[in-house]
């Protein structure tokens, strides 16, 4: 028989805050002459021989089709008049901490999803407000007045719906999805808008006739589970507005990684590979302390100009040995388009995908 929870907890009040074009907006705030112009956070490809990747860009740049993870060269081709800025990760981190301090005025139940987004559970809150919408508006006001930035907010009874709501109207939007509105809202939503559905999964879903949340709502959950494993169950639940994951201040460990910053830049590939061996040994030691193995290896490389490359590789077996981790990291490094002229200031190796092989369904 099938076993998975169909209980839908609609009692929580969850806010998802997503800073609007965060890095680019900070740069525009600090240099008002950039306002209204297409700003791209990446090194100018004319100065790097076409190298570099877009971290993010302003909404004016997005109007030209530019988006994050695009090559800087492609961004330039789409908009030659774009203003390219290398970016300042330390500054963005500082601003992110300032945003978090604003959150803390209303609740301590905060889960950072990334440097520019977070979930807040305001079911119980510090100002005794019954309305999550009121708190979301106050947060938007505080961030705009005190930091000169805008954010979009989504409000609903779970994290999945709050995240979708914050994406619905940007920039500086505020969207509420009530429990009795969730199914209708999700029914119209394209599957590619479901948080967690990647580019590789979309064509598979389309091939099966699943184009919207409504299609998934009518699906046979057994069939989804047989085709996609535990992910199929989760997708069926999400399409039906069910996502009972709590906002966690301290997340359950999902990865183990180590990073090193270098005062003296690394240039030679052999030097980088030697460092990856050292870092992999540290990661292995940490994995073994926590009795964990993972089948996803992630390499992070940051150039001297703060351009950051992140690439992952899925392995057949779960790993925890320093030799296996280092070999996987080396393979990833050799697959990236490494620019030896820039110099590397940071390297990182992370292992995730814990317990993937254990994620099986009870079907009898």
Curated annotation (Swiss-Prot):
Record Gene3D superfamilies: 3.30.70.270, 3.40.1170.60, 5' to 3' exonuclease, C-terminal subdomain, DNA polymerase, Y-family, little finger domain
* Entry's Gene Ontology BP terms: DNA-templated DNA replication; error-prone translesion synthesis; SOS response
Q: Per UniProt, which keywords does this protein have?
A: Cytoplasm, DNA damage, DNA repair, DNA replication, DNA-binding, DNA-directed DNA polymerase, Magnesium, Metal-binding, Mutator protein, Nucleotidyltransferase, Transferase
- Keyword Ubl conjugation present in the record's keywords: the answer is no
Annotated catalysed reactions: DNA(n) + a 2'-deoxyribonucleoside 5'-triphosphate = DNA(n+1) + diphosphate
Localization, per the record, is:
Cytoplasm
Pfam families, per this entry?
Answer: IMS (PF00817), IMS_C (PF11799), IMS_HHH (PF11798)
- EC number(s) on file: 2.7.7.7
Does the keyword section mention Methyltransferase? no
Q: Catalytic residues?
A: 117
By sequence similarity, the record places it as follows:
Belongs to the DNA polymerase type-Y family.
How it assembles, according to the record, is: Monomer.
Spell out the protein name for this chain. DNA polymerase IV
């Amino acid at each position: 028989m099938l076993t998975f929870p169909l209980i839908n907890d609609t009692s929580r009040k969850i806010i998802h805050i997503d800073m609007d074009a965060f890095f680019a907006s900070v740069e525009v705030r600090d240099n008002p002459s950039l306002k209204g112009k297409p700003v791209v956070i990446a090194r100018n490809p004319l100065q790097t021989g076409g190298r570099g990747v877009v971290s993010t860009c302003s909404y004016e740049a997005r109007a030209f089709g530019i988006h994050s993870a695009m090559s800087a060269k492609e961004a330039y081709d789409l908009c030659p008049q774009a203003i390219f800025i290398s970016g300042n990760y330390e500054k963005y981190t500082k601003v992110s901490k300032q945003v978090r301090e604003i959150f803390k005025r209303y609740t301590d139940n905060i889960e950072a999803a990334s440097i520019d987004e977070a979930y807040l559970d305001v079911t119980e809150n510090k100002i005794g407000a019954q309305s999550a919408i009121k708190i979301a508006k106050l947060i938007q006001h505080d961030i705009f007045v005190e930091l000169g930035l805008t954010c979009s907010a989504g409000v609903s009874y779970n994290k999945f719906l709050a995240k979708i709501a914050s994406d619905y109207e940007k920039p500086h939007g505020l969207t509420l999805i009530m429990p009795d509105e969730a199914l209708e809202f999700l029914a119209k939503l394209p599957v590619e808008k479901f948080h967690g559905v990647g580019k590789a999964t979309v064509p598979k879903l389309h091939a099966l006739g699943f184009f919207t949340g409504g299609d998934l709502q009518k699906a046979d959950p057994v069939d989804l589970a047989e085709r996609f494993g535990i992910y199929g169950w989760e997708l069926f639940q999400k399409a039906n507005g069910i996502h009972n994951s709590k906002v966690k201040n301290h997340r359950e460990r999902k990865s183990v990684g180590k990073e090193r910053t270098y005062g003296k830049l690394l240039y030679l590939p052999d030097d980088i590979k030697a460092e990856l061996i050292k870092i992999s040994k540290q990661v292995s030691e940490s994995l073994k302390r926590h009795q964990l193995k993972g089948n996803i290896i992630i390499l992070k490389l940051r150039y001297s100009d703060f351009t950051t490359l992140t690439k992952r590789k899925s392995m057949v077996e779960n790993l925890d040995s320093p030799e296996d981790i280092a070999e996987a990291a080396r393979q990833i490094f050799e697959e990236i388009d490494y620019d030896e002229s820039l110099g590397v200031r940071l390297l990182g190796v992370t292992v995730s995908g814990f317990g993937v092989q254990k994620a099986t369904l009870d079907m009898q």
